[in-house]
Each structure stands twice: as C-alpha cells, then as structure tokens.
C-alpha cells in the first residue's frame, strides 16, 4: 500500500492510503481538485513535455486555471497566481534550448531562496511549471480530453462545448419591515 501526504488548502496535513500504484494519479487528481497539494515545488518548477501544455491537468499538482477580469489566463496554486509566458528557443554556442512555456510569478520576500530565480536586473521570480521538449505523456492530460473540463480551454472545432451549469446565488428571505412601536428581535 502506498501513502501520499497532502497539505489541504487550509494547511492541515492529511495522509491518504492508495491501494495500488495504478490509482496514484487518480488520487492526486481527486484531492488536487480540492486545492490540496503534495510535496513542494521543485527549484525551477515542475518539468513537463511541451506537448502536454494545452491540456495539462493542473489538479495533479493541486492547481487550477483561472481567467482574470482582464481576460488573462492564470494558474492558481497555493493562493499564488502564475502567469503563462512563452520563451523563445535559445541557440548559442554555449546553450541550446527549444522553445518553452513557463508559468511563473514575481518572487515575494516570504519565498525560500532555493525557489527564486534571477531575471534581468534585480527582478526575481518563482516558476511553477515549465513545458519544454520531451514526448507527450497521456497521464498528465485531462482525462477525457480538454473540452468541457472547466479548465478554460475551448472545445475543438466541429464539436459543441458542453454546457456549464450556472450557479444560482442564494438570497435570504425578505424580512417584513419593523412596525412603529415594535422592537426588532436580536438575531442571536
């Protein structure tokens, strides 16, 4: 039997038993959808194949996609918002790197030194994930494809997007107005 230790979105540590290794990613997805995380972000961020970026299942690491009011796609992980950045290929005498997509944010004073990366000047940032090179891994993709998964991706052309149920706001029942000479009841 395997065990995974998660940190809930409220900071509690929870150990979950996994019957078989074939269920490991399913368990991570389940608790990741709740915002629970396991482990720490590695220095430089998680490394994934670039072919997985379009339909990556962010719940595997306890993250979720979110679209800002300005329309910018972000990834939320442990209360921090990470921006999508496209990095050009590097081809120099000393370094050759293929193009990549990185999700990162500006570093904060509370971030441990080992996760901070230097940029131009005095700017530091923290990377959540980088998608570069490699061969596609189906196990990292959203199960059942990206369409209609709530991860912010459109349905493929020629296929209708699944309708997303709309949440209805709960409204308190209207209270009758207080009549003159009548005292209002204390709510507790």
Swiss-Prot record:
Changing residue 85 to A: Reduced ssDNA-binding. It comes from the Bacteria. GO terms for biological process: cellular response to desiccation; cellular response to gamma radiation; DNA repair; double-strand break repair via single-strand annealing. It holds the Pfam family DdrB. Induction: Induced to high levels following extreme ionizing radiation exposure. Also highly induced in response to desiccation stress. Coiled coil: none annotated. Disruption phenotype: Cells lacking this gene show a normal growth rate, do not exhibit a decrease in the efficiency of natural transformation, but display a reduced capacity to survive ionizing radiation when exposed at doses superior to 2.5 kGy. DNA repair following irradiations is slower. Cannot be complemented by ssb. A double recA-ddrB disruption shows no signs of DNA repair 24 hours after irradiation. GO terms for molecular function: single-stranded DNA binding. Residues 152-173 have a biased composition (Low complexity). Changing residue 108 to A: Reduced ssDNA-binding. Transmembrane segments: none annotated. Residues 140-188 are annotated as: Disordered. Changing residue 132 to A: Reduced ssDNA-binding. ssDNA-binding protein that contributes to the ionizing radiation resistance of D.radiodurans. Plays a role in DNA repair and genome reconstitution in a RecA-independent process. Required for recovery from severe genomic fragmentation as a result of exposure to severe levels of ionizing radiation. Binds ssDNA but not dsDNA. Stimulates annealing of complementary ssDNA. Does not complement an ssb disruption. Homopentamer arranged in a ring-structure; DNA binds between subunits and along the top of the ring. The pentamers self-associate to coat ssDNA in higher-ordered structures; oligomerization facilitates the assembly of extended nucleoprotein complexes. Self-assembly does not however require ssDNA-binding. Interacts with SSB. This is Single-stranded DNA-binding protein DdrB.
């Amino acid at each position: 039997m395997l065990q995974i230790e998660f940190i809930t979105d409220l900071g509690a540590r929870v150990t979950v038993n996994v019957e078989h290794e074939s269920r490991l990613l399913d368990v991570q997805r389940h608790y990741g959808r709740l915002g629970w995380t396991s482990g720490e972000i590695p220095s430089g961020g998680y490394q994934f194949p670039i072919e997985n970026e379009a339909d990556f299942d962010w719940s595997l690491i306890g993250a979720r996609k979110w679209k800002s009011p300005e329309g910018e796609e972000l990834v939320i992980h442990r209360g921090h918002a990470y921006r999508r950045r496209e990095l050009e290929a590097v081809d120099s005498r000393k370094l050759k790197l293929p193009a990549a997509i990185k999700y990162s944010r500006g570093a904060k004073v509370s971030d441990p030194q080992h996760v901070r990366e230097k940029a131009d000047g005095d700017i530091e940032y923290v990377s959540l994930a980088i998608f570069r090179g490699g061969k596609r891994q189906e196990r990292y993709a959203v199960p059942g494809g990206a369409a209609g998964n709530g991860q912010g991706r459109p349905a493929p052309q020629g296929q209708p997007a699944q309708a997303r149920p709309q949440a209805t706001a709960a409204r308190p029942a209207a209270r009758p107005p207080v009549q003159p000479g009548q005292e209002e009841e204390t709510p507790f």
